[in-house]
Amino acid sequence: MSLLVVDNPSDRPEWIAETIRLVAGVAAEGRRSLLHLVEETTDVDLLAGSPDDWGLGQIAVHLLVVDRGVSLIVLRLARGEDAGNTGQPRPAPSRVTREGIRTLAEKAATAAERLRTDFPPEPDDHRTAAHPFYGPMNCFGWLLTIPNHYNAHLSAYREGRPSPL
């Protein structure tokens, strides 16, 4: 069987837009699932945790801050801009509140919508920023961490084990 290999397909802009839409959808589902867990848990369990053994509140704050931050990093890199701060947020349990979690979820959803609507059809895929664990990644590398991050933390929480992510 012979194949035609195309290095620059004509439908790349549509493929990119669909990828953004799909990742945003998975992230939205992750946020919904996370908020459901937060709503169902007691205040004691929500505020439990330590710097080395995170409780649900810390996980929620971490996921939502990362979701928003990565969406903005992806958009900046795609535009050829500096990514800004790329470190890992580690929330203290004493700083967790239900209202704060709801606010962070709204901010993450707003950033995801902005990513979906403002991502350029021909992004800069050469500019990179250092991920705290994976090293230098372009906008697509960063984008694809979002669903994995939700999945890792939420699966670990449901299974009663810590997530190395």
Give residue ranges: language-model regions.
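Generic structural concept
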Residues: 24, 28, 53, 60-64, ...
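Bulky hydrophobic/aromatic packing residues
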Residues: 16, 29-31, 65, 89, ...
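Short, contiguous alpha-helical
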Residues: 43-87, 125-165
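Short, helix-capping/interhelical loops that line the mouth of catalytic, cofactor-
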Residues: 1-22, 68-130, 165
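Terminal low-complexity, poorly structured segments
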Residues: 1, 30-33, 111, 139
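Long, hydrophobic N-terminal alpha-helical segment
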Residues: 12-47, 51
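Solvent-exposed, charged/polar functional surfaces in cytosolic regulatory/catalytic domains
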Residues: 33-37, 110-118, 152
